[in-house]
Amino acid sequence: MKRYLLDTCALAWYFVKNERMDTLGEDIEYYRGDFAISMDSVKELVYLLQYGKMQLGMDFKSLIELLISLNIGIIDFGMDCLNVLSSLPACKNHTDPTDRHIIATAIAKRRILISGDKKFGQYVKNGLTFLEI
């Protein structure tokens, strides 16, 4: 069975019922346990919620409870991820450190990264399996 890593935007779109996530949202609910997010996405969500840059219609505690109920795992950034991160090329058009951590996590954990960010596609040659939504 395929294993997926949702980036921060994909997860947020799922929670706000964005049409880009309609089919995938059904899959998340059907294939419980095959979807995860990185700890970096969790950190980014905390920041976005605290500073009012994103509205999910729930507080952070409710968000975590929902992740647990959907069996969406949280993957920590370990040495395997750090090794991948250190081998990624320095791309001048993509310097966001959180994105690069998420990409490294997907590669290290052999998960398909789901994102709406077209820039992620440039890492396919580095071992990323990418599903653009």
Q: Across the structure, where does each feature detected by a protein language model lie?
A:
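Acidic catalytic patch
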Residues: 64-91
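Donor nucleotide-sugar recognition loop
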Residues: 91-98
